[in-house]
Regions:
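The conserved acidic donor/metal-binding loop of glycosyltransferases
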Residues: 13-17
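Short aromatic/hydrophobic "clamp" motif used to bind/position activated sugar donors
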Residues: 9
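Conserved donor NDP-sugar-binding/catalytic core segment of glycosyltransferases
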Residues: 21-52
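Nucleotide-sugar-dependent glycosyltransferase catalytic core
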Residues: 105, 118-145
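A recurrent flexible, glycine/aromatic-enriched loop bordering the glycosyltransferase active site
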Residues: 38, 44-45, 52-75
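Short, conserved alpha-helix that lines the donor NDP-sugar binding/gating region
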Residues: 1-2, 97-98
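Acidic donor-binding loop at a coil-to-helix junction in glycosyltransferase catalytic cores
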Residues: 90-96, 105
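Catalytic beta-strand/loop signature of glycosyltransferases that borders the donor
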Residues: 41, 107-115
């Protein structure tokens, strides 16, 4: 982050899908909220094992809170100047958000669009070893079409 330039910093994950309007979409909440960090909690998820797309946490959009998904972090440069990401192999995203909240920064969950959380069926592929029960709780099954057809606007 020290080498970055500009007023905002975004965190991406190379195994998830980001739509062509993702960055513009994530910048919008900074115009109508007083959030310091934005991201997505309500997300589209492609579950490879079931070959279906789901909407996760459908009620968790357009609201302040204490959690957004790590691969969707988008924050003001000032945040990274005052709160450092811990050097951990697991839990760095959650701890970063906790540290930001403790420092007085506000977190805002945006809409689910322009991002797809890709959940592979290969064991050990993901840092978070979640069960299917954990992944599919609080979801709405959408269908087996290409996940981009639901998510990208």
């Amino acid at each position: 982050m020290e080498l970055s330039k500009g007023n905002f910093i975004a965190k991406f994950d190379d195994d998830d899908l980001y739509g062509p309007n993702y960055i513009a979409d994530q910048l919008l909440p900074f115009e109508y909220t007083d959030a310091d960090i934005v991201g997505k909690l309500c997300t589209f998820m492609y579950h490879e094992k079931s070959a279906k797309t789901y909407l996760r946490f459908p009620k968790n959009r357009h609201k302040y809170g204490d959690l957004v998904l790590g691969p969707t972090f988008f924050f003001k440069r000032e945040v990274s100047e005052n709160v450092k990401m811990r050097d951990l192999s697991k839990g760095e995203d959650t701890n970063f958000l906790k540290d930001c909240l403790n420092a007085g920064y506000k977190i805002y969950a945006t809409d689910p669009y322009n991002f797809v959380y890709m959940r592979k069926k290969v064991e050990g592929f993901h840092t978070w070893d979640a069960t299917d029960e954990q992944l599919l709780s609080n979801t709405i099954a959408l269908g087996s079409e290409n996940p981009e057809s639901y998510a990208f606007v």
